[in-house]
Amino acid sequence: MCPARDTGVALVMTRLDSEAMSLFLAELSQAIAPRAHAVVLMDKAGWHIVEDLIVPANISLVFLPPYSPELNPIERLWLYLKDNRLTHRVFADTAEIIDACCDAWNGLLAETGRIRSLCSYPWIEQVIA
């Protein structure tokens, strides 16, 4: 997600590993404006720190300190999605879960100003100003 542009990129996948993370970074790379560079904040989940992770040239990874989810703006976004679009539901199968997640993400993108309001931390505002 990009609070400055009030937008984001996501892939809904059924696994979390270095291959999935590399696919996400490749997708994100394609969404970055020409001659721009993205900084991606990440915790140190296993699939974020493997040696075979493919990081495109227009992306830099910044790792947060251990046990500090409050520093990661994406955590507020996930909480919003869970609380407002995915909670109190029963899904018949994996395909239905994937569809619901895609609908939730696309609905979030359609809410003008939502990503900015959830993810614009004061220190991010200072960095992008």
Positions of the model-derived regions?
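Short functional hotspots at interaction and active-site rims
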Residues: 1-129
